[in-house]
Amino acid sequence: MISGQYIKKLAENAGFDLCGITPCKHLAENESYFREWLAKGYGSSLEYLERNLDKRFDVRHLVEGAQTVVVCAVSYKNPLGEGYPPGCRTKIASYARSRDYHPVLKRMLGTMLEALRRQYPGLTGRTFVDTAPLLEKQLAVEAGLGWIGRQSLLLTPQYGSYVLLGELVLTLPSDQYDAPFAGARCGRCRNCLDSCPTGAIVAPKVIDTNRCISCRTIEKESDSALPDLDGWIFGCDRCQSCCPHNQKAPMHRSPHFDPLFDPLTISDREWLAM
């Protein structure tokens, strides 16, 4: 059995801002909702979402012998995430202005896994950073990190939605698990629904990826059927920058997530060199 306190200390030492621990289980309620969402065609711009559904809702089908999921989060908010002036035509999602977070978080998780293997010789496990059919936002809720906001993003009390997630899936149980996050803290706020430039948030927690600027500029080439991109050329932060929880969130503390450029001042030559 693994010490939950030891896991969280490793996460802190690795540089993560948040860490929660949850037992592996079948997320049946989420599977029912997700299948209904797919049936309505809201995910048709992201065909890969229809694959590996059995693994997506039960991590035990993804990692043999899995018993525990450790969900870690790191804040990435920077001053450039506060929003763009009206009329700006070169908007880029806040997270994309810094280094690619995938290898950064992968190294952090790898450091944790190596330490756990030394401490618990019989342990095996895998690390994940947005690279597998893992329902990471819901796992974060199950691990007590936050709730799902009306814009369908994980919202944490400390850092809002400006967090990047990574997971450790382990084959031993923990001596303590965190309680799932109870309730939501959006109140009557509708800022994200009312601010989406393309109306992609068709209902609270329901996203039509065919309209979502972030999905269409990152996951799939845009076409004439897409509404006006409102100046966004990679990703979109509108449903985040308007959120009160994000407006009061602190800036990140890791140099890995310092912006590499300012889209408001970057030259044409610098754009082409990227």
Please place each PLM-identified region on the residue numbering.
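Auxiliary alpha/beta "docking" domains used to position bulky ligands
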Residues: 1-185, 231
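Short, flexible, mixed-charge acidic loops at enzyme active sites
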Residues: 82-88, 209, 269-272
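A short, flexible beta-alpha/helix-coil linker loop
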Residues: 175, 218-219
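Glycine- and acidic-residue-rich phosphate-binding/metal-coordinating active-site segment common to enzymes
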Residues: 178-179, 222-224
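SIR2/sirtuin NAD+-dependent deacylase catalytic core
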Residues: 188
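C-type cytochrome heme-c attachment and multiheme electron-transfer modules
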Residues: 252-274
